[in-house]
């Protein structure tokens, strides 16, 4: 197995995930879901039946798969997609062709200072992977903040019930 820098590995994983999310999704491949008919119909607050979103008949609007393809073609023309795929393939080949060698601590220290012992000077995968990892951190942190806000809200709303649970810990009393 080849040893590679974290930035190149992150770029490789990012490329694989993006490729599989775009080309591996059922909507992108044009698959249609069968009409799922539950035994009991679902009604909204006014008593009107809810629409079955998995129906195969359309309402005069294109299918989600065609809308996704149209949006993808609109925002990413074929030339730009080819360039992006070429860049990804080049980075992927570079990672796969890298010789397997154990790096010394001095090499890792030099790399931290911006010095790449075996790489080229025009390697710009570092900023891309840094931006990607920053985005992952931001997403994770915002998800954590949302979870904490929900917990705080539920503690405020269900505070009385929560206190009852703690108070009656050994006894089984239905609360809900």
UniProtKB/Swiss-Prot annotation:
<dbReference type="GO" id="GO:0043204">
    <property type="term" value="C:perikaryon"/>
</dbReference>
<dbReference type="GO" id="GO:0007204">
    <property type="term" value="P:positive regulation of cytosolic calcium ion concentration"/>
</dbReference>
<feature type="region of interest" description="Important for receptor binding">
    <location>
        <begin position="150"/>
        <end position="158"/>
    </location>
</feature>
<keyword id="KW-0732">Signal</keyword>
<keyword id="KW-0372">Hormone</keyword>
<dbReference type="InterPro" id="IPR046963">
    <property type="entry name" value="VIP/GHRH-like"/>
</dbReference>
<feature type="modified residue" description="Leucine amide">
    <location>
        <position position="158"/>
    </location>
</feature>
<dbReference type="GO" id="GO:0060124">
    <property type="term" value="P:positive regulation of growth hormone secretion"/>
</dbReference>
<dbReference type="GO" id="GO:0043547">
    <property type="term" value="P:positive regulation of GTPase activity"/>
</dbReference>
<comment type="similarity">
    <text>Belongs to the glucagon family.</text>
</comment>
<protein>
    <recommendedName>
        <fullName>Pituitary adenylate cyclase-activating polypeptide</fullName>
    </recommendedName>
</protein>
<dbReference type="GO" id="GO:0016521">
    <property type="term" value="F:pituitary adenylate cyclase activating polypeptide activity"/>
</dbReference>
<dbReference type="Pfam" id="PF00123">
    <property type="entry name" value="Hormone_2"/>
</dbReference>
<dbReference type="InterPro" id="IPR000532">
    <property type="entry name" value="Glucagon_GIP_secretin_VIP"/>
</dbReference>
<dbReference type="GO" id="GO:0005184">
    <property type="term" value="F:neuropeptide hormone activity"/>
</dbReference>
<dbReference type="GO" id="GO:0051428">
    <property type="term" value="F:peptide hormone receptor binding"/>
</dbReference>
<feature type="signal peptide">
    <location>
        <begin position="1"/>
        <end position="24"/>
    </location>
</feature>
<feature type="modified residue" description="Lysine amide">
    <location>
        <position position="169"/>
    </location>
</feature>
<dbReference type="GO" id="GO:0070374">
    <property type="term" value="P:positive regulation of ERK1 and ERK2 cascade"/>
</dbReference>
<keyword id="KW-0165">Cleavage on pair of basic residues</keyword>
<dbReference type="GO" id="GO:0045944">
    <property type="term" value="P:positive regulation of transcription by RNA polymerase II"/>
</dbReference>
<dbReference type="GO" id="GO:0007218">
    <property type="term" value="P:neuropeptide signaling pathway"/>
</dbReference>
<keyword id="KW-0964">Secreted</keyword>
<feature type="region of interest" description="Disordered">
    <location>
        <begin position="98"/>
        <end position="135"/>
    </location>
</feature>
<dbReference type="GO" id="GO:0007189">
    <property type="term" value="P:adenylate cyclase-activating G protein-coupled receptor signaling pathway"/>
</dbReference>
<dbReference type="GO" id="GO:0031891">
    <property type="term" value="F:type 1 vasoactive intestinal polypeptide receptor binding"/>
</dbReference>
<feature type="propeptide">
    <location>
        <begin position="173"/>
        <end position="176"/>
    </location>
</feature>
<keyword id="KW-0524">Neurogenesis</keyword>
<dbReference type="GO" id="GO:0032880">
    <property type="term" value="P:regulation of protein localization"/>
</dbReference>
<dbReference type="GO" id="GO:0043005">
    <property type="term" value="C:neuron projection"/>
</dbReference>
<dbReference type="GO" id="GO:0045860">
    <property type="term" value="P:positive regulation of protein kinase activity"/>
</dbReference>
<comment type="function">
    <text>PACAP is a neuropeptide involved in diverse array of physiological processes through activating the PACAP subfamily of class B1 G protein-coupled receptors: VIP receptor 1 (VIPR1), VIP receptor 2 (VIPR2), and PACAP type I receptor (ADCYAP1R1). Exerts neuroprotective and general cytoprotective effects due to anti-apoptotic, anti-inflammatory, and antioxidant actions. Promotes neuron projection development through the RAPGEF2/Rap1/B-Raf/ERK pathway. In chromaffin cells, induces long-lasting increase of intracellular calcium concentrations and neuroendocrine secretion.</text>
</comment>
<dbReference type="GO" id="GO:0031892">
    <property type="term" value="F:type 2 vasoactive intestinal polypeptide receptor binding"/>
</dbReference>
<keyword id="KW-0027">Amidation</keyword>
<dbReference type="GO" id="GO:0005576">
    <property type="term" value="C:extracellular region"/>
</dbReference>
<dbReference type="GO" id="GO:0008277">
    <property type="term" value="P:regulation of G protein-coupled receptor signaling pathway"/>
</dbReference>
<comment type="subunit">
    <text>Interacts with ADCYAP1R1 (via N-terminal extracellular domain); both PACAP27 and PACAP38 neuropeptides function as ligand for the ADCYAP1R1 receptor, which modulates the activity of downstream effectors. Interacts with VIPR1 and VIPR2; functions as ligand for VIPR1 and VIPR2 receptors, which modulate the activity of downstream effectors.</text>
</comment>
<feature type="propeptide">
    <location>
        <begin position="25"/>
        <end position="80"/>
    </location>
</feature>
<dbReference type="GO" id="GO:0030073">
    <property type="term" value="P:insulin secretion"/>
</dbReference>
<dbReference type="GO" id="GO:0031175">
    <property type="term" value="P:neuron projection development"/>
</dbReference>
<dbReference type="GO" id="GO:0007188">
    <property type="term" value="P:adenylate cyclase-modulating G protein-coupled receptor signaling pathway"/>
</dbReference>
